[in-house]
Amino acid sequence: SYLRMVDDLGDIPRGLAPHSLRAVPVDLLPELVQAGRDLLGDGFPMHIHISEQQREVEECMTSCGASPIDSLADTVELDAHWNLVHATHVTQSELGRITSAGARVVICPLTEAYLGDGIFPASDFVFRGGELAIGSDSNVRIDAVEELRMLEYSQRLQQQLRGCLATQDGLGGHLWSSTAEAGARSLAMNAGKLEVGAMADIVVLNAHAPPLQGPRGQRALDALVTAGSRENSADVYVGGRQRIKAGQQEGQELLGRQFAKVVGGLLND
């Protein structure tokens, strides 16, 4: 039945995601990777939560004799198909191993702040040529703009500098486009960019939203990341199909009532 579910995905890319070295013994990973190749062929994406909290690192050092990232890199062949989620407590030498292998880091700034995990050295990683994607980690607040703001502001707090992830063209446009493209690559999807042949995933901003009044071009995207939120999106298209129109999702009222019913039932229990 599981394989039928996989087949039902159609053209949606499939991957392998052992949760973490806390949940999956590191010496089992080569067998899992081979099973993935047998099922999916070559080139599928692999995701794993790693070095998210200091206690995880300490326990891995005790049980494996090495940190989670080093244990992973010593056991499997890291490459561009691997996506290391969080990697909060990465060392400088581990950053070098990740970038040399071409592996990707996926950080979840709002969740990591909520849990008090720590701060990933994003600006250092990007300076080394590392590729950074953004995930939500199923946090209770799903907002891509807030994730990017938390990413940039955490670096500012850590380094006591401004514009840590900005380029000479600004902050917002670079952050949005680079993480969108990296996120698409982390899922082996032809998305995250506007070009012929790519998925038509498009966000149309509300130019009348207060944070976007006045700024134009790249400055508008700077304003979005520093002062805006998901509420500043007017229309959203996924694969060319409009999902949000004028800030409203199709069937939003019904979904709201269903959500309230489910939450009410959980709280009453």
Question: What residue ranges belong to the model's regions?
Answer:
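Thr-Gly-centered strand-to-loop micro-motif
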Residues: 84-86, 107-110, 134-136, 239, ...
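Metal-coordinating catalytic core of metallo-dependent amide/deamination hydrolases
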Residues: 1-87
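Divalent metal-coordination and catalytic microenvironments
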Residues: 16, 49, 84, 98, ...
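His/Asp/Glu-enriched, well-ordered alpha-helical/loop segment
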Residues: 74-78, 123-209
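Active-site microenvironment of metallo-dependent hydrolases
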Residues: 174-269
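Glycine-enriched alpha-helix->loop->beta-strand junction motifs that scaffold or abut catalytic
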Residues: 33-43, 77-80, 97-106, 127-132, ...
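Catalytic core of soluble alpha/beta enzymes
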Residues: 52-103, 113-124, 138-145
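Short beta->alpha connector loops
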Residues: 22-23, 87-91, 111, 189
